[in-house]
From Swiss-Prot:
One of its GO terms (cellular component) is chloroplast. Belongs to the bacterial ribosomal protein bL20 family. The gene is rpl20. It comes from Nasturtium officinale. Keywords: Chloroplast, Plastid, Ribonucleoprotein, Ribosomal protein, RNA-binding, rRNA-binding. It is found in: Plastid, Chloroplast. Binds directly to 23S ribosomal RNA and is necessary for the in vitro assembly process of the 50S ribosomal subunit. It is not involved in the protein synthesizing functions of that subunit. This is Large ribosomal subunit protein bL20c. The lineage of its organism: Eukaryota, Viridiplantae, Streptophyta, Embryophyta, Tracheophyta. Pfam families: Ribosomal_L20. PROSITE patterns: RIBOSOMAL_L20. It comes from the Eukaryota.
């Protein structure tokens, strides 16, 4: 019986895996089994942290808006400010409001005066 040489498919798969894990430290970039485990772990972390990043930015925007509202001396809190925005049907999201709060506080002050009851 003649010897059958293995194909290139497994080698190609491992090469692709090795390129992905080349920046990992120690055995995580050298041994195939640990490379596979670390790749799965890295992709899970990336997937989880994409959602976390969205939550973190939303918290940051809310904090910035709240800080500027309290600094301006407006007599209501952040949640009442957002509630009044919705009642007056001003469609400004928190990202835009935070940018206005940082760059142009007088504009945010006029918005708050417009929606105040």
């Amino acid at each position: 019986m003649t010897r059958i040489k293995r194909g290139y498919i497994a080698r190609r798969r491992r090469t692709k895996l090795r390129l992905f894990a080349s920046s990992f430290r120690g055995a995580h970039s050298r041994l195939t089994r640990t490379m596979t485990q670390q790749r799965i772990r890295a992709l899970v972390s990336a997937h989880r942290d994409r959602g976390k990043r969205k939550r973190d930015f939303r918290r940051l925007w809310i904090t910035r808006i709240n800080a500027v509202i309290h600094e301006m001396g407006v007599f209501y809190s952040y949640n009442r400010f957002i509630h009044n925005l919705y009642k007056k049907q001003l469609l400004l999201n928190r990202k835009i409001l935070a940018q206005i709060a940082l760059l142009n506080r007088s504009c945010l002050y006029t918005i708050s005066n417009e929606i105040k009851e």
